[in-house]
């Protein structure tokens, strides 16, 4: 695990520990059981054409603040109005300015499947995601031992959610497939130095194989990048910074899906 990723994971563990002290796992289990049924994240990404997972995050660790007017409910409605297929919500606090509360607000404001975007390493975070209304969550291969990845993926599905399993190279694709991942996200951003390689999805497409949803993550600057990824065989793109900086994110999404 890279130094940058290790630091983010350590902070996620610390944040989870603080929340665990305030709300027990037993209580979360009750809340998760009472949450509305999960919306089908994978099915939304399998719709004809290029699907868009529209992400909301107030900050970037490498670029700082992305907006000075962060309103998750309004963003969720704008994303849905623009034709997004799903919403991704950063809940990691340090570096991203996220909060679990943002997810609950976004989920209540739209009818799209909502993904919890965080550094998930603990079953508590999975229960918390479902209790907040999440329909899916992110699992990063580079942050987890293979057996741990498989266990967390199974726990995610037992809670009625799907996982976006993130990879960055051939070995990680193999680990994701062995764990049973159905939705695989190729992160074009190298978490060791935050550099971007937009050709990565094309190189890994054959490795992922058919029958699974493949998502291109990071570095989509506009419609040309989206079209290139679609031509490479990607089923969906996850777009964050472009939308956060857009004056009209709904119109920007229409340009990506059109």
From Swiss-Prot:
Belongs to the TrpC family. One of its GO terms (biological process) is antibiotic biosynthetic process. It comes from Streptomyces coelicolor (strain ATCC BAA-471 / A3(2) / M145). Keywords: Amino-acid biosynthesis, Antibiotic biosynthesis, Aromatic amino acid biosynthesis, Decarboxylase, Lyase, Tryptophan biosynthesis. One of its GO terms (molecular function) is indole-3-glycerol-phosphate synthase activity. Pfam families: IGPS. Disulfide bonds: none annotated. It catalyses: 1-(2-carboxyphenylamino)-1-deoxy-D-ribulose 5-phosphate + H(+) = (1S,2R)-1-C-(indol-3-yl)glycerol 3-phosphate + CO2 + H2O. The keyword DNA-binding does not apply. This is Indole-3-glycerol phosphate synthase 2.
